[in-house]
Amino acid sequence: DFCLSRGLGDVYKRQLLVLTLAMLLSLAPAEVVFSGLTSTACWLIVSGLVIGIAISETGLAQRVSDLFTRYLDDSYTRLIAGIVLMGILLGFVMPSSVGRIVLFIPIALAIAHSCGFETGSNGQKAVGLAAAFGSHLPTFAILPANIPNMIMIGSAEKIHGWSPLFGEYLLLHFPLLGILKAIFLVMVLLWLYPDSPKPRPPAGPGRPFDFRESRLVLIMLVTLGFWLTDTLHQISAAWIGLAAATLLLMPGVGMVSTQSFNQKVNISSILVVAGLLGIAGLINHQNISGVLGGHVLSWLPLEPGRDFTNFLALSLTATATGMVTTLAGIPATLTPLAGPMSEMTGFSLEAILMTQVLGFSTIIFTYQSVPLMMAMPLAGIPMRHAARLCLILAALTITILFPLDYLWWKWLGWI
C-alpha cells in the first residue's frame, strides 16, 4: 500500500512481481497466491464496472444527477457535503457498501460533470472520493450497513450470546464515528482538492424515459432486491452482480457494447485488487493473524482501573488487527478474546465487543477495504488518492475521535 500512496510506477506490475516470487519460492500453493482472482471482491469490481458503464451510457446517471445538481452547484462546500450526506443516507436503506457504491458513483460523477468539473480535475476527484468514502466510512456507525458489522454481531451472538440493538449501536457510534468523521472527510477533501463549480447550462426540457433506461432500472431493481435479501437466499453479492453484468453485456438485451467494455473496463485496476488480495491470502497462509490473536493478550497494557489506557489499547489493537487480517478479520480474530479482555480491564463484555467498531471503521491502507478498492476504478480515480485520504483520516480518527469516543462512552455509562 506504500506504493499506492506514493504512486510509484504501475502498481499492478508490483503486485504481479510479488505473486510471481511467491510461486517461484513456493511460499504458498497457487490457490492461495492467486486467490484474489477467484475472490468475490475481484468479481464485484468487474460487475460494478459494467453496471457503472450501463448507468452512465443510458443517460440514467445524468437524469438522476439533474435532480440534485441544482441544489448543490452554487457552493463547492455544499456540493462535497451534499455528496457525503447522500452516501450516509444510503447507508440507512442499503445494507451493502458494494451496492451503494455501484449505484452512487456514476450518479456522483454525473453531478460533477454538471457542475463543470472535467475528468481528472480537483473537483471531479473530490466528488468521486466523497461518494466512495461517504458511502462507506461513516456507515460503519449504522448497525447493518457493512460486512464487518454483521460479522461482529453474528460472532458475538454465537460465542457470547449477545448482540446490540440498532438504537443503542447508533447512539454509541453515530455521533462521532458517523457525523464527526463525515465532517472531517468533507474538510479534508476541501483542503486537498480545492476547486469551484462552474454549472453547465441545462440541456433542455426533461426527456421521457426511453426503453433502454426503463430496462436498466428494472435490472437494477431486481439486482438491488437480491442484494437486500441475501440473508434469505444466501447468494453472494458478487454472483448477483455478475449475473446483472452478464445480462447487461448480452447482445440484444443489454446496454453495454463490446467496444464500451473493452475501452472502459480497466484490467490493470482489477489486477491491482487481485494482487492485494493474493498478498493478504499469503499473510493469512503464514498464520500471522493467528499468531497475533494468540499473543495479543500478553502484549496489551491492560489493567483494571486504567480506563483510558485500556480503551485506547483495545481500539488500537482492533485497528492494527485490520492491517493484518483486513476489516472483516477484526471481529473474527478479536471476538473470541472478548471474555479474557473483559476480565483484564474490568470493562463489560459488551464494551469490549464495541471497541472493535473503532478498529474496523478506521482504514489505514486501502487493501483493507474491498468497497474502496472497488470504488476507485469505478470512479476513474488513481488508488493513491484513496490511500492518502485513508492515512489522513486514520490519523485524525486516532488522535481526535478515539479520545472523544472515550469521553462519550464514559458519559453514556458504557465504561
Language model: regions and residue ranges:
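Single conserved hydrophobic/aromatic residue that forms the stacking wall/gate
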Residues: 1-8, 12
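Hydrophobic core segments of alpha-helical transmembrane domains in multi-pass membrane transport
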Residues: 5-6, 18-25, 47-52, 83-91, ...
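Juxtamembrane helix-boundary/capping and inter-helix hinge elements in multi-pass membrane proteins
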Residues: 26-28, 57-60, 70-74, 111-125, ...
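Interfacial loop-to-helix junctions that mark the boundaries of transmembrane helices
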Residues: 31-40, 164-175, 208-211, 229-240, ...
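Core transmembrane alpha-helical segments of multi-pass membrane transporters/permeases
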Residues: 34-62, 84, 88-89, 93, ...
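Structural signature of hydrophobic alpha-helical transmembrane segments
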Residues: 39-50, 100, 176-179, 236-245, ...
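Hydrophobic alpha-helical transmembrane segments of multi-pass integral membrane proteins
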Residues: 72-107, 302-345, 349-358
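Juxtamembrane and boundary regions of transmembrane helices in multi-pass small-molecule transporters
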Residues: 100, 118-151, 155-208, 218, ...
